[in-house]
A protein has these predicted regions:
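Glycine-rich beta-strand-centered segment in the early N-terminal region that forms part
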Residues: 22-40, 52-95
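NAD(P)H dinucleotide-binding glycine-rich loop of Rossmann-like/cofactor-binding domains
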Residues: 57, 74, 90-152
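Mid-domain Rossmann-like dinucleotide-binding core that forms the NAD(H)/NADP(H) cofactor-binding site
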Residues: 124-194
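Short glycine/proline-centered loop/turn elements that form peptide/ligand docking sites
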Residues: 76-78, 174-183, 216-218, 240
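Glycine-rich phosphate-binding loop and adjacent beta-alpha segment
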Residues: 217-253
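A short acidic, Gly/Pro-enriched loop at the edge of an enzyme's catalytic core
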Residues: 202-209
Length: 253
């Protein structure tokens, strides 16, 4: 089968090589999926640049791709949640990526059936982003009835985070470009702030949670709008000793 693989890490010129490898076999708990679509997201670029090799030291060449959509072609003996012909999607385990291929062998617990209202291409954009947001809300201990500030609500991650947060019963405040305000409010945001005309650090305070999708200087600004004991989860920032010192946090935290 054809696959797209990393053969070297390169920070400046991300290149994948198309090659042929054997079609994967499956274990008793796995599903063989014939791939119809695959998502491309920043994590794929980070892997290509070698930015996660300290966490997951991939052995090159490595087939790329984290998000997969496809049709179940065969199932393992102990798989009881799928049947041949099901349309499925999933976020592949970080240590077993490989969605940029004609087929993938996946643990059945890493997959779900695709809702009929999603096309294959639409479904391919969901797993990694949605699971990341769910993990962030779990880390916060997010509780219904409390308030969350989601930075960059007009972006792809923010656009996914808003309806998920609302489904969990949270009050959502977000910001972004004013020309997208109507779309963001239609996603369920309770309050939208146009960053060009309003400084949220002056008009928002005492929020319970912050989901930082921007990083950089915005992370520190968002710390200032939380109530004491609030929780911030950043999807972009890389905290270090200098950050801890500026924010009066212990370095081990």
């Amino acid at each position: 089968m054809k696959v797209a693989q990393h053969t070297t890490y390169n920070k400046n010129n991300i290149t994948l090589n198309i090659t042929e490898i054997a079609k994967p076999s499956i274990t008793d708990k796995q599903v063989l999926v014939k791939v119809t679509a695959a998502g491309v997201n920043p994590l794929d670029n980070m892997i290509s640049r070698g930015e996660v090799k300290m966490i997951v030291p991939y052995k090159l060449p490595q087939t790329a791709g984290n998000e997969v959509v496809g049709i179940v072609e065969s199932i393992g003996k102990k798989v009881d949640n799928f049947q041949v012909g099901n349309r499925v999607f999933g976020r592949l385990p970080l240590d077993h990526i490989g969605a940029f291929a004609e087929y993938v062998a996946v643990d059945s617990q890493a997959l779900a059936k695709v809702p009929d209202y999603l096309s294959d291409e639409e479904a391919a954009t969901v797993p990694l982003t949605a699971l990341t947001i769910m993990q962030a809300l779990d880390l916060m201990g997010a509780q219904a009835g409390k308030t969350i500030f989601i930075s960059g609500g007009t972006g792809g991650v923010g656009g996914m985070a808003i309806p998920i947060a609302k489904a969990k019963g949270l009050k959502v405040i977000t910001n972004g470009s004013g020309d997208s305000a109507e779309r963001v409010l239609n996603l369920g945001a309770d309050r939208f702030i146009d960053y060009k005309t309003e400084d949220y650090t002056k008009t928002v305070s005492e929020v319970d949670y912050v989901l930082d999708t921007l990083g950089g200087a915005e992370t520190e600004k968002q710390m200032s709008i939380m109530k004491k004991g609030g929780h911030l989860v950043s999807l972009r920032a890389m905290p270090n000793g200098a950050f801890a010192k500026r924010m009066n946090l212990p370095k081990w935290k």
